[in-house]
Amino acid sequence: MALTLRVLCPDQNVFDGQADEVILPSTTGQLGVLPGHVSLLTALDVGVLRMRDGNQWTAIALMGGFAEVDDDEVSVLVNAAEPASGINAEEAQKQLSEAEQAWSKFDGQPNSPDKIKAQQAFQKARARLQATKAN
């Protein structure tokens, strides 16, 4: 028995298919979902969704949102998502380095819109790079 997984963004359907296992980046930590999982609704952090089909693992970088698990269906609604297969690892590493430098300029400073924006850019860049390493 498998899970039906849907990953949806406002502008696209990123994934719609079957998976034997799904690992979600919830705001309280990694959340594993197998067939027969109890129903739940959870907030998702910026991070990597991992799904297993047989022995094959696939990753999708998620940019925050929500997930619902109900009757072996996992619906993931996110602000943005990018399959690892579409991410250039070298470019992702470069973006992470740039985002880390931009964020480090705010060390020791109180929160400001610019600091929060830099932190979010860092988290997104890190998720993209992690997704390339998850496959």
UniProtKB/Swiss-Prot annotation:
It comes from the Bacteria. Pfam families: ATP-synt_DE, ATP-synt_DE_N. Residues 91-122 are annotated as: Disordered. It is found in: Cellular thylakoid membrane. Produces ATP from ADP in the presence of a proton gradient across the membrane. The keyword Thylakoid applies. One of its GO terms (molecular function) is ATP binding. This is ATP synthase epsilon chain. Keywords: ATP synthesis, CF(1), Hydrogen ion transport, Ion transport, Membrane, Thylakoid, Transport. PANTHER family: ATP SYNTHASE DELTA/EPSILON CHAIN, ATP SYNTHASE EPSILON CHAIN, CHLOROPLASTIC. Belongs to the ATPase epsilon chain family. F-type ATPases have 2 components, CF(1) - the catalytic core - and CF(0) - the membrane proton channel. CF(1) has five subunits: alpha(3), beta(3), gamma(1), delta(1), epsilon(1). CF(0) has three main subunits: a, b and c. SUPFAM superfamilies: Epsilon subunit of F1F0-ATP synthase N-terminal domain. One of its GO terms (cellular component) is proton-transporting ATP synthase complex. It is a peripheral membrane protein. The gene is atpC.
